[in-house]
Regions:
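Phosphate-/nucleic-acid-contacting segments
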Residues: 162-225
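Short, locally clustered residues in the helix-turn-helix/winged-helix DNA-binding domain
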Residues: 44, 56, 162-166
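A short beta-loop-beta micro-motif enriched in histidine and acidic residues
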Residues: 30-31, 42-52, 70-72, 95-96
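Polybasic "coupling" helices that flank or enter modular domains
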Residues: 103-104, 121-186
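Cyclic-nucleotide recognition modules
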Residues: 75-132
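A generic structural motif
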Residues: 63-67, 101-103
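Cyclic nucleotide-binding regulatory module and flanking cytosolic helices
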Residues: 1-38, 82, 87-90
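Glycine- and acidic-residue-biased ligand/ion/polar-headgroup-sensing regions
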Residues: 40, 50-63, 78-80
């Protein structure tokens, strides 16, 4: 991406851009790079201050990883979204580690974490923006935790399937049982058993080639109430 194009992007996404000095702007631009990630590639493992990630194309997935290897998907990022939790050095008040993977082939702009951290020390607006951006995602995180702790599996699975078809604009969730289990923080056997029940009730049909097709959206939605 050309320098002038990057400046226009930053003017749009960082409300404090015009308050930065010319030296800070130059440092900010030097610390930025366009990075291409392939599907399944790990972007941030929770140990490094990767930096702030702006999604241009594709889709990223943020999740937690338990000690026994179970993944719990927190939320996904789409074009135009920003990942602030990958800049842990900026968010010193947030102590849990998230992992970021490319769910699809993705093009992103990555702003170096150290450059942003240095700016945030001297420009309160940059620090406030980082915290507000991170906090805006905690409603998504709390929703996931609420589902895991308080909702039955049939309700959770119904919500997941309806959310997926809403995002894709299709009536089919093209995922394997293993993938669904991974995204939901469950076991494949549990998901397979629940999908078998949904199939017997005429809510969905399941095939290895096509995934899970929604047959009765109204009744599936009733399970979420």
């Amino acid at each position: 991406m050309e320098k002038h194009e990057l400046i226009e992007v930053y003017k749009d996404v960082f409300p404090f851009w015009d308050k930065m000095g010319e030296l800070d702007k130059a440092t900010f631009l030097r610390s930025s790079q366009t990075v291409y990630f392939t599907r399944g590639e790990n972007i941030h493992d929770g140990n490094e201050c990767t930096g702030i990630i702006l999604v241009k194309t594709g889709c990223l997935r943020l999740y937690l990883l338990s000690e026994d290897g179970k993944e719990i998907t927190l939320y996904r990022l789409f074009p135009g979204d920003m990942c602030m939790l990958s800049a842990s050095c900026v968010l010193d008040a947030i102590t849990f580690d998230v992992i970021v993977d490319a769910e699809e082939d993705s093009e992103c702009i990555v702003v170096g974490g150290c450059a942003y951290e240095d700016l945030a020390r001297r420009l309160p607006e940059a620090k406030i923006f980082a915290l507000e951006t991170a906090l805006s995602r905690f409603s998504d995180v709390m929703w996931v935790m609420q589902q895991i702790l308080f909702m039955s599996m049939d309700k959770r699975l119904a919500i997941f399937l309806l959310d997926e078809v809403a995002k894709s604009g299709s009536d089919t969730v093209k995922m394997t049982h293993e993938q669904i289990a991974k995204y939901m923080g469950s076991a494949r056997e549990v998901i397979s058993r629940m999908l078998k029940y949904f199939t017997s009730e005429g809510l969905v049909s399941v095939s290895r080639r096509d995934g899970v097709k929604i047959l009765d959206r109204r009744r599936l939605r009733d399970l979420t109430l």
